[in-house]
């Protein structure tokens, strides 16, 4: 996953930028200077007003939308027995799940104690607008 906006920001270059930022948010990495990703390291900032939050949501949901379009286009052919269709469907489901994995890990409370709390929006069709639902659903 590559960011089409990569030229707009020095620390926004897709999935690898997400991985580096989240590594710095944990306690397993020391940051000795004040350059790229310093606010991720110092603040662990996930507020809605933070630029990185906007980037995560826009980019991951754009990939989810693309995966949903591929899934919608291939569902009719799924029973054809064509292995390449099955592989593309599997890859699209995996990519979509991986994006949701990132969003849930960043913005979700632990499942076991928060089943009734609102979760992230789940889109399984292209061009849908859904309301948030409790995590238990």
Placement of each model-derived feature along the sequence:
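Acidic, glycine-rich segments characteristic of secretory precursors and extracytoplasmic regions
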Residues: 1-20
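Conserved, well-structured interaction surfaces
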Residues: 33-107, 133-136
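Generic N-terminal helix/loop capping motif
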Residues: 4-8, 27, 70-77
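Non-catalytic effector/regulatory segments
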Residues: 2-8, 32-39
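Active-site substrate-recognition loop segments, prototypically the cytochrome P450 B′-helix/B-C loop
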Residues: 17-36
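Short coil/linker segments at helix-helix boundaries
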Residues: 106-137
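Acidic helix-start/capping segments at beta-turn-to-alpha-helix junctions
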Residues: 18-23, 87-88, 94-95, 123
């Amino acid at each position: 996953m590559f960011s089409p906006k990569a030229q707009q920001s020095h620390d926004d270059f897709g999935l690898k930028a997400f991985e580096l930022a989240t590594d710095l948010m944990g306690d397993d990495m020391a940051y000795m200077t004040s350059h790229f990703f310093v606010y991720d390291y110092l603040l662990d900032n996930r507020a809605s007003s933070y630029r990185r939050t906007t980037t995560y949501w826009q980019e991951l949901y754009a990939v989810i939308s693309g995966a949903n379009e591929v899934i919608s286009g291939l569902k009719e052919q799924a029973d054809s027995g064509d292995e390449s269709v099955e592989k593309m469907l599997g890859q699209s489901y995996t990519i979509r799940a991986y994006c949701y994995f990132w969003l849930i890990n960043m913005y979700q409370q632990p499942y076991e104690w928060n089943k009734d709390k609102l979760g992230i929006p789940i889109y399984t069709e292209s061009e849908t607008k859904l309301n948030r639902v409790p995590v238990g659903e």
